[in-house]
Amino acid sequence: MAAPSSRPESNPPLYKQALDFALDVANGRHALSKLIPPALFLVDALLCGLIIWKVPYTEIDWAAYMEQVSQILSGERDYTKVRGGTGPLVYPAAHVYIYTGLYHLTDEGRNILLAQQLFAGLYMVTLAVVMGCYWQAKAPPYLFPLLTLSKRLHSIFVLRCFNDCFAVLFLWLAIFFFQRRNWQAGALLYTLGLGVKMTLLLSLPAVGIVLFLGSGSFVTTLQLVATMGLVQILIGVPFLAHYPTEYLSRAFELSRQFFFKWTVNWRFVGEEIFLSKGFALTLLALHVLVLGIFITTRWIKPARKSLVQLISPVLLAGKPPLTVPEHRAAARDVTPRYIMTTILSANAVGLLFARSLHYQFYAYVAWSTPFLLWRAGLHPVLVYLLWAVHEWAWNVFPSTPASSAVVVGVLGVTVAGVWFGAREEWEPGMKSSSKKEEAAMR
């Protein structure tokens, strides 16, 4: 009987091999995947230089910042009397210190080119930190191009020199150190960012939960919170010592009036509704409600107790909410991905229900959206599509009803998607799928 002939296995078509190779690199399954972040970083550095060279600088707030610093250097300590061309000083004291340094470095603000170069460096440092956070959270490499492609984000940093750039850097540095379980450094950096701009208050509930669950000790958590409060006091001492009420009312003003002509997010509701007190209260109520849903059903899950069970021992018996073994078990579930998902989702919830977003607020959106859309479980094509639509909406000037509806819509999809799609990140018993996914990527 003749032996069956053995045919050599044919190789897959060349296009199939190329596609498999590209998918392996994009999903982190190839050694070349590690080259994607540094390659994109270098390209973006060149792009920043090209923008400074070719695109005219846009004056918005820089001159006002310099005028305000000049008044403070002249001895003014009453925040209600410090004004610039675009209005009063409404930022905490860390903003003043940073722009005082820039005031001296840039010849009292006159050397705009040097200021742009400094902000380009600030952008690159922030981008490096963001990439480090993404890598630590095991985000797939195909997300990284989205970190470098935003026209609006480059404009915020390199062409407009907003103080949001520093606040965003401190926020990402805090996430970076939290992921490495350096709670003291992370808490310090976060509160410094809050000292630049109070927009970082949006992520404060999540930061508090991350510190509580991750530090492994209720006492340590209280110490960290006390340190953050003390830093805020020390930052404001030159102003608190003379005009405390004026400083607090301006630097952390929560009742500020917003102009309909500048809104990026709520133009589609019309000016009458936008300016109404009922609309403001509705947004506040929705913000609190959705935050409560995330806290009770997602963020505190590593504690393996309900919110009532956590609070009751503290209020009724003065005892820590978790025993030492319980706290250690919870801390093990506070992974780099949990930290990033929790803090960025809190930020997204706050931005979704914000009374009014201006164009510079995209600095808090641009680098978080790709990660959150991925955590929502969306297909990469949908991630790129939603990112592109959102980017378009933030580049429409002035905003239109259509563009503002897109801004709110994508934020809504992001928040809802994370709540539904990333639930395993907060469920102690559902992490096996995440670990398998990470193993497949690396």
UniProtKB/Swiss-Prot annotation:
Protein topology in the membrane: Multi-pass membrane protein
Entry keyword set: Endoplasmic reticulum, Glycosyltransferase, Membrane, Transferase, Transmembrane, Transmembrane helix
Main location: endoplasmic reticulum
Pathway per the UniProt entry: Protein modification; protein glycosylation
Catalytic activity: an alpha-D-Man-(1->2)-alpha-D-Man-(1->2)-alpha-D-Man-(1->3)-[alpha-D-Man-(1->6)]-beta-D-Man-(1->4)-beta-D-GlcNAc-(1->4)-alpha-D-GlcNAc-diphospho-di-trans,poly-cis-dolichol + a di-trans,poly-cis-dolichyl beta-D-mannosyl phosphate = an alpha-D-Man-(1->2)-alpha-D-Man-(1->2)-alpha-D-Man-(1->3)-[alpha-D-Man-(1->3)-alpha-D-Man-(1->6)]-beta-D-Man-(1->4)-beta-D-GlcNAc-(1->4)-alpha-D-GlcNAc-diphospho-di-trans,poly-cis-dolichol + a di-trans,poly-cis-dolichyl phosphate + H(+)
EC number: 2.4.1.258
Topological domain spans for side Lumenal: 1-34, 106-111, 177-198, 242-272, 355-376, 423-442
Stretches that traverse the bilayer: 35-55, 85-105, 112-132, 156-176, 199-219, 221-241, 273-293, 334-354, 377-397, 402-422
GO biological process: dolichol-linked oligosaccharide biosynthetic process; protein glycosylation
Signal sequence residues: none
Localization terms from the record: Endoplasmic reticulum membrane
First-level EC class: transferase
Gene Ontology molecular-function annotations: dol-P-Man:Man(5)GlcNAc(2)-PP-Dol alpha-1,3-mannosyltransferase activity
InterPro entries to which the protein is assigned, alphabetical: Glycosyltransferase_ALG3
Biological function: Dol-P-Man:Man(5)GlcNAc(2)-PP-Dol alpha-1,3-mannosyltransferase that operates in the biosynthetic pathway of dolichol-linked oligosaccharides, the glycan precursors employed in protein asparagine (N)-glycosylation. The assembly of dolichol-linked oligosaccharides begins on the cytosolic side of the endoplasmic reticulum membrane and finishes in its lumen. The sequential addition of sugars to dolichol pyrophosphate produces dolichol-linked oligosaccharides containing fourteen sugars, including two GlcNAcs, nine mannoses and three glucoses.
Protein name, per record: Dol-P-Man:Man(5)GlcNAc(2)-PP-Dol alpha-1,3-mannosyltransferase
Lineage: Eukaryota, Fungi, Dikarya, Ascomycota, Pezizomycotina
